[in-house]
């Protein structure tokens, strides 16, 4: 514990003398008494099962108190507000070291998670809501500050960059000079005295300010390992970890830099707006139309960081020149005297972008990350991986799907590459879950397992995002530029609607009931997929000509849930999807004419699925054992044409049918592989 104590204490110590502003003696605009509704509104965001702070009050206890005796909390909170000092335990945090990687005996290979008072969090949540309203009313934040702002999304930044690149580079043939800035431990290095001074200068005064001042000047933390906690040490630097106010306070600390950039002439013009910076918390990207413009922006940033005691990681700060061809262009850019690296790709807010703005590289990165997650599930489950398909599909949807569909509210409506990496991985996972070969027809796999293409899910997220933007919800810059240009993100939405026969919904109508309309849009996407897919398997040349006889409704097949024996189930799946070794299929690969694909045991008989089920003499004893009882339950079964028999037997596969297919397949394969006597 001593190693962790010394390490985290060292991180929390300021290297400079602090000059904390004095307490405020005037009544501030945020000092009005709390009401019950404020507490109840803040309590709605509290979740069960969260760890307690030093005072051991858990969320369950607090929520019960809010529900039964809210006025008790109201009196407590108002007393604290009037006194301008929080309860001492609320300024105490317990740091839990979480291992990252590297040698486990090195404390530097751990990150700290700070547990603070849950009751204190509720009080500060009320203050946070007040501060949000105050910052909006007084325009404290710049429109370029997207992060930690209500209803903004990471996709907002991606859409803005997409439209910039498409219009300026692809349409106009210009270049955009950009720099992706990496602040070094930005949240942990904010000087607290400068933060408080800036807040005071913004008009955040009175008791509200004094409470923030009291928390930040008495803040302490100890190291928690198991049930034990070390002595407490002072925290002199950075916004408080785990505090709900911290994201907004960090934004307010940087807002003077953002507004400085806003006032500059060096901007990339798009429509009626100019853009030279986008902030997402501590992720900053700078834009300019010329090299000299970006040099100026970098100089402003360098001076600001020196003045505000922030550090930039120049090794991780990269420059990129957006251009139509996507080639790597090199120009010298410097920050703090260090030459910055020019890159061809950069992972910005979790999605890889390139100089041309193409999305295939980003999709491949998502595919690779999702594949790792899928393989981990597969390796962890071992032999039981295929045991319960519904559970595996739930794991796929909860652990892998969110990774592969990350940022799809941005890219889901864009023109996807023909060899879509996301869809390729989805098909690979579905085929491994079913236990069929890679060559199995994709349409049949999706229908059998009851899945839809992930591209439809991605399109749905994009449409939902479009609904939000159309209703005027989102960042001010985004609302200005999302329609700009012939190849804008909005035009991609229009193309998506047109390709699905829904162009009539592309309207600006305030009276339009968007939730109802979008419900219809989503249903149309699903219907179009199923219509197209069922049409594909019904084609005469389709490999799934037999499958089309009995697969008439979408959804997970019942036998995939009911049959627990993996070997039997996989034999049935392969048989249904024509992923078997009957002559009707193997003849495709060795060039045998369809009319000459004979059964190896029955002279002059075409060996297809119907022959295997109803006629092959080699399987007669198995047929009597497994299929005869089923046939007797279907009146006139023997007089049906083969297409009717297949539909009757395979539409809802009974266990005995599964056993026949599995045992029959294994017997057939054994007899074929057995050496035959010569002569």
Task: Report the location of each language-model feature.
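Surface-exposed loop/turn segments and immediately adjacent short secondary-structure elements
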Residues: 1-109, 122, 289, 347, ...
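Active-site-proximal segment of RNA-dependent polymerases
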Residues: 12-41, 85, 91-94, 133-189, ...
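Short, conserved micro-motifs composed of acidic
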Residues: 29, 227, 311-344
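Conserved catalytic palm subdomain of right-hand nucleotidyl-transferase polymerases, strongest
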Residues: 48-57, 105-115, 156-200, 611
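Conserved polymerase palm-domain catalytic core
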Residues: 183-281, 286-297
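Family-specific functional microsites
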Residues: 384, 537-679
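Extended C-terminal regions of large enzymes
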Residues: 399, 421-426, 437-583, 679
């Amino acid at each position: 514990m001593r190693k962790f104590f010394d390490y985290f204490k060292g991180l929390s110590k300021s290297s400079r003398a602090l000059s904390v502003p004095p307490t405020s003696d005037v009544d501030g605009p945020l000092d009005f008494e709390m009401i019950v509704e404020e507490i109840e509104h803040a309590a709605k965001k509290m979740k069960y099962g969260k760890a307690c702070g030093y005072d051991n009050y858990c969320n369950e206890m607090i929520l019960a108190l809010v529900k039964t005796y809210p006025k008790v909390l109201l009196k407590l909170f108002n007393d604290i507000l009037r006194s301008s000092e929080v309860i001492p335990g609320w300024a105490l945090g317990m740091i839990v070291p979480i291992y990252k990687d590297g040698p486990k005996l090195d404390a530097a290979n751990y990150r700290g998670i700070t547990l603070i008072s849950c009751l204190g969090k509720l009080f500060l949540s009320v203050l946070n809501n007040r501060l949000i309203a105050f910052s909006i009313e007084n325009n404290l934040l710049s429109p370029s500050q997207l992060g930690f702002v209500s209803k903004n999304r990471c996709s907002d930044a991606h859409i803005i960059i997409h439209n910039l690149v498409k219009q300026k580079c692809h349409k106009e043939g210009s270049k955009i000079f950009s720099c992706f800035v990496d602040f070094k431990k930005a949240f942990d290095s904010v000087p607290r005295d400068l933060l408080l001074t800036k807040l005071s200068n913004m008009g955040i005064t009175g008791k509200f300010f004094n409470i923030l001042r009291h928390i930040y000047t008495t803040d302490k933390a100890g190291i928690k390992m198991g049930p034990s906690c070390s002595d407490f040490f002072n925290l002199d630097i950075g916004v408080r970890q785990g505090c709900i106010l911290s994201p907004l306070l960090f934004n307010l600390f940087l807002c003077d830099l953002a507004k400085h950039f806003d006032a500059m002439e060096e901007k990339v013009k798009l429509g009626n707006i100019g853009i030279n910076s986008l902030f997402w918390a501590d992720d900053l990207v700078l834009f300019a139309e010329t090299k000299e413009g970006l040099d100026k922006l970098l100089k402003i940033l360098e001076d600001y960081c020196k003045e505000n005691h922030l550090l930039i990681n120049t090794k991780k700060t990269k420059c990129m020149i957006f251009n139509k061809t996507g080639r790597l262009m090199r120009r010298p850019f410097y920050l703090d005297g260090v030459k910055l690296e020019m890159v061809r790709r950069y992972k910005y807010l979790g999605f890889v972008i390139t100089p041309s703005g193409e999305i295939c590289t980003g999709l491949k990165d998502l595919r690779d990350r999702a594949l790792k997650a899928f393989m981990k599930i597969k390796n962890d489950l071992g032999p039981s991986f295929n045991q319960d398909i519904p559970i595996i599909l739930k794991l796929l949807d909860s652990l892998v799907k969110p990774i592969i569909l990350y940022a799809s509210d941005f890219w889901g409506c864009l023109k996807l590459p023909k060899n879509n990496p996301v869809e390729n991985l989805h098909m690979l996972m579905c085929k491994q879950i079913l236990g069929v070969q890679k060559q199995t027809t994709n349409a049949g796999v999706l229908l059998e397992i009851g899945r839809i293409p992930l591209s439809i899910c991605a399109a749905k997220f994009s449409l939902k995002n479009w609904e939000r933007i159309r209703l005027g919800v989102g960042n001010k810059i985004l609302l200005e530029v999302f329609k700009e240009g012939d190849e804008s993100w909005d035009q991609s939405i229009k193309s998506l609607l047109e390709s699905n026969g829904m162009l009539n919904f592309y309207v600006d109508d305030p009276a339009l009931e968007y939730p109802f309309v979008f419900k219809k849009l989503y249903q149309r996407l699903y219907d179009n997929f199923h219509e197209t897919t069922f049409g594909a398997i019904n084609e005469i040349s389709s490999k799934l000509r037999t499958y089309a006889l009995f697969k008439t409704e979408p959804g997970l097949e019942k036998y995939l849930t009911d049959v627990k024996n993996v070997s039997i189930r996989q034999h049935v799946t392969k048989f249904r999807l024509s992923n078997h070794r009957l002559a009707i299929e193997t003849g495709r690969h060795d060039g045998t004419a369809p009319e000459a694909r004979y059964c190896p045991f029955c002279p002059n008989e075409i060996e297809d699925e119907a022959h295997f089920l109803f006629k092959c003499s080699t399987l007669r004893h198995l047929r009597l054992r497994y299929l005869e009882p089923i046939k007797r339950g279907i009146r006139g079964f023997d007089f049906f044409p083969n297409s009717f028999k297949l539909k009757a037997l395979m539409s809802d596969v009974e266990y005995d049918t599964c056993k026949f297919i599995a045992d029959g397949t294994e017997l057939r394969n054994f007899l074929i592989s057995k050496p035959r006597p010569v002569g």
